[in-house]
A protein has these predicted regions:
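Membrane-embedded hydrophobic alpha-helical segments
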Residues: 1-40
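Conserved non-transmembrane functional hotspots
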Residues: 26-196
Length: 196
């Protein structure tokens, strides 16, 4: 080996070491940023599910099941005008089942509106809150013994249930995807001892 080539070899080795160190740093930095973004995204998805779309979904499903049960008890296939002989049962179901579920949903929509997926408030959510407010007026009349109005003057927004189900399902799918990606599992194994 030529003595003149030793400095060149050492020089090349030093350059290669610096390149490898910088590459390792950039790869680590990039993966840390990607994992942080994924973690933040998962945190937002979880918050939306736990505080907004989850409660809306559960209350909506429970309300739908209860409403179908009431219709079945009354021998009806679909919503029809409430007859005089059904009024007592209707008031009971409204005050003990439907309005408490409506109140839960109304509170979630009003207090957690910042968690909606869209940039603008979906019209069906506004229509739902308006529907509930209409029922509050009807129920105030009931409390005074006035039963001429039987339903909210603002009808049930049919797209509300579709929106809630679709949004909940999309967020659950996104949550599952974020939780089960290979990078996320590796991150948890390395830094938390197990995959979550």
């Amino acid at each position: 080996m030529d003595l003149l080539s030793v400095p060149t070899i050492l020089q090349n080795a030093a350059i290669l070491t610096v390149i490898l160190a910088l590459s390792g740093y950039f790869i680590t930095s990039l993966s840390t940023q990607m994992l942080a973004r994924r973690r933040d995204k998962l945190r937002l998805v979880n918050k939306r599910l736990n505080e907004f779309y989850g409660p809306l979904y559960v209350a909506s499903e429970a309300g739908d099941i209860a409403y179908r049960t009431l219709l079945k008890r009354q021998g009806k296939q679909r919503s029809e005008p409430i007859r005089d002989e059904e009024m007592k049962e209707w008031v009971l179901w409204m005050t003990t089942i439907f309005m408490p579920l409506n109140d839960i949903r109304e509170k979630v929509i009003i207090e957690k509106a910042h968690l909606i997926i869209e940039e603008r408030m979906p019209q069906c959510l506004l229509d739902f809150v308006t529907h509930v407010v209409g029922y509050k007026a009807v129920m105030a009349k009931w409390a005074e013994g006035e039963y001429t109005e039987r339903r909210s003057t603002i009808g049930w927004p049919p797209e509300f249930d579709v929106y809630v189900k679709r949004s909940y399902a999309a967020l659950k799918a996104e949550q599952t995807s974020l939780l089960h990606s290979g990078t996320w599992r590796l991150y948890h194994r390395l830094f938390h001892g197990k995959a979550k």
